[in-house]
Amino acid sequence: MKEAARWFLTRSRSGTWRSHVVLSGVLLFMCWQFAGPPPTFPLSSSYRAFQDISPDEGAWAVFFGLSGLQGIAGTLPVLERFYAVRVTSCAVLAAVHTVIGGLFWMGSPASIGSGTFLLWGSMALGNLLWEPRQCPPS
């Protein structure tokens, strides 16, 4: 237990690790939003592009859930030795956040879409800016 606490405290000082966890949490929130009632699509025109790709909100929930869990897995100590896996995890999260930003922008470019695109785009960029000295190759 003491070793686990030490591991967590060491990692939680890393801005990269914290952002990885938070950005993965955002995807899990999107999973929850699409999975539960009421349906999300009728609530906002910003979701129009999501609906055009697939009107099944359950499919979107699975997509966001798997992406978020993959991101959380990238923070686990088991993968700490595999630098390429961690970098890939960061890249996948960045790609998913960029796609989400683009879909929000296409769904409602005139109103909330552009601001939402910038928000999601900046989250994507933030996830690519990991600190190599804290993720040394083994």
Label every PLM stretch briefly:
Residues H20, Y47-S67:
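A loop-to-helix transmembrane entry motif
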Residues M1-F29:
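Cytosolic juxtamembrane helix and N-cap/initiation of the first transmembrane helix
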